Amino acid sequence: IAKYPSGILFAGVNAFFAGINEYVREGSAFVFRANSLPEGNPTDPMVLLGTFAFGVLPTVIFFASLMSILYYLGLMQLLIRGMAWVMQKTLGTSGPESMAAAANVLVGHTEAPLVIRPYVEKMTRSELNALMVGGFATISGSLMAIFVFYGISAGHLLTASIISAPAALVIAKVLQPETETPKEVDAVSMAPEQIATNIIEAAAIGASDGVKLAINITGMLIAFLALLALLNAMVMGLGELTQYFINLGRSGNDVDLHWSMNNLFSMLFYPLAWIMGIESGDCAIAGELLGKKVVVNEFIAYSEMGEIMDGKVLDASGNVVTMTDRTRVIMTYALCGFSNFGAIGIQIGGIGPLAPERRSDLAQLGLRAMFGGMLAACMTACMAGVMYGW
């Protein structure tokens, strides 16, 4: 996907997202226009559109509306059915779990189960696990625009989401092998539910859903960034207190502790980064990004990765943190997924109403499925590292 033919797909995907950003700026500039204010004023459209809230979140709204239109026209269903058919025939998975895995490539982990709504109640535990792992291992198309804003390659993001879908099915079957008899359903014959009655209503429904998603993202980022800062301050304070008692009564050679959440994440996930093939010099920062992705969410991880790529992150000594291009590519794949602790509750809350009597199964599978999604993303990252430079 990345190399054939000569990177045309990557260039096309990157150009597509760049074009979308330009179209969104037209609508955003009109909404946030302030004609009576001088150029360069903080409320000037061009200044506002450089911020996350006014420059990126409108892209989510537009993309959600566009996806809804494509869904109404039947193009989304055609693409999802095609991918589901390939996975069902090559991997031997059931129709519902193949269909959900294919849908996860394009939509979110709470929207994908709606594609197989009539079948969720009768799914086996192995199929339920596959449904959840697939959601944790991929990202939605609407969120790709946000990560592109951070400087992440749209081509790599799309490739990561595509190859993580079958990888998620493989990991899911390893974690929860099929011991029951799944209901025989052909993925191609499954008809996703159609809501809109015309293309205008489809655009309106998509825009409305996009607004809800944008507001949710805004609140989540504000809360999680504030909580992360609070936790970091607590860890640093504990480190300073520990350092004081260790050095109490010592003469010279004082212990200098640099405790922080970043250092904690780095130490915990350093081995995983090394196993993925990241060179030792980048394992510390890669482990930190993996930790933030799992403990907090992928937004924070990609945001910091973008700042590292721009040379805006400094280490404890005041030196600019860097990473090699190969590490950047591997981490793009490793971070591409909803596998974090908060997403467990979101996914259970999204799938639960479709099959209330399966809530206990969903709760039991939640943590395992989240780690399965993380492993699937890391597995695709390993493949990206192997293929890098070919």
Which residues are covered by each model-predicted region?
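Juxtamembrane inter-helical linkers in multi-pass membrane proteins
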Residues: 80-115, 182-202, 244-251, 261-267, ...
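Long, contiguous bundles of hydrophobic transmembrane helices that form the permeation core
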Residues: 162-215
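N-terminal alpha-helical transmembrane segments of multi-pass membrane transport
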Residues: 1-53, 201-204, 221-227, 350, ...
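Alpha-helical membrane segments and immediately flanking helix-loop junctions
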Residues: 88-147, 287-371, 375-383
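Hydrophobic core segments of alpha-helical transmembrane domains in multi-pass membrane transport
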Residues: 1, 60-69, 138-146, 161-176, ...
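Transmembrane helical segments that form the transport core of multi-pass membrane transport proteins
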Residues: 208-317
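Individual transmembrane alpha-helix segments
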Residues: 35-67, 312-336
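Cytosolic juxtamembrane amphipathic/interface segments immediately preceding
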Residues: 38-48, 87-88, 112-121, 193-211
